[in-house]
UniProtKB/Swiss-Prot annotation:
Name used for this protein in its record: Queuine tRNA-ribosyltransferase
Residue numbers binding Zn(2+): C308, C310, C313, H339
EC id: 2.4.2.29
Gene symbol of the encoding locus: tgt
Organismal lineage: Bacteria, Pseudomonadati, Campylobacterota, Epsilonproteobacteria, Campylobacterales
One Pfam family matching this protein: TGT
Keyword annotations from UniProtKB, A to Z: Glycosyltransferase, Metal-binding, Queuosine biosynthesis, Transferase, tRNA processing, Zinc
Amino acid sequence: MEFKVEYKSANARACRIKTTHSEILTPAFMPVGTLAAIKSLDAIDMSEILDAKIILANTYHLYLRPSSKVIKQMGGLHGFSKFDRSFLTDSGGFQAFSLNKISKPDEEGIKFKSHIDGSLHYFTPKSVLDAQYDFNSDIMMILDDLVALPASKERIELSLKRTIKWAKEAIDYHKLKQNQGVGMGQNIFGIIQGGTDFEARRICSQALCEMDFDGLAIGGLSVGEENEVMYDTVEAMMPYVDNNRPRYLMGVGTPEDLVENVARGVDMFDCVMPTRNARNGTLFTSFGKFNIKKAEFITDHSPIDSKCSCYTCKNFSRAYLNHLFKAKELTFFRLASLHNLHYYLNLAKQMREAIIKNEFENFKKEFYRQRTC
């Protein structure tokens, strides 16, 4: 993977990442395709209409169904889904933890039951990489020990111990596999844990920065803490996160979260929010968000956002979308998802342009001003 910080505006960064399958300009938002598909959209929508350079898929779900072996047989995620740009796959540890009441992390990994058929499974630092080698994802995430917030000091210390141990096992295993000719075009990111404890974040950041990861992710935030707590935690740990590698904040977030964390030096984001909200009728715009189901839109000729150039806004009215949503017409999911994802991807482009011009602070002020109009 090639990586370069091209421009800065205060702490905000505009970077260039080159993988085997695409070139990614940051700040970058990654649409979430849990099952190797963005809900209601296909590979053509993602590449030709939205021009997404990278999407995220989920190791836990794909490992269970259809299985990593089936995906490998079908040509990896790219051959299977026909999305020919970059894939980032998470380790599945979060899902193993959050979807299973009986999940049991220990010193070697995480035991869990399949939410599909109840079968027992065990994720280890090596096994989650083996699945991702089968996927041939461009960026692989390591297994980490997630801390549910709020957490005791003892639980955070245990999480750090496991996360650092598993990170070392993962990077050593990846080097071994590459020496054997496996995963040659694949990259591996470490995940920094520590809850909202600044000292724990510093310790974990420094430990992982000493390892030869291609990029560094911030995990364990946006899990119920107040927004300001998340922002303060990111800001406190950034001095200890390597400047010369991509920085990825996992599972974040709202448009405001993206702007605030880009201001603090984050490069990459993913979140289900744009597509999940789209399916519930909530649409993002330059002036905030609104729900299309309201009666005021029944005869509204205007597009979702007059400043938006997406496929949906160029072709359809609020009135039509209001009708589709109330009629439970499946077409609504596609049109709303196209709009919301375009909004997020375009927000990332606008932030990049502002950073290149060294005007990010002005962009941020205007971003919030429009939301109060």
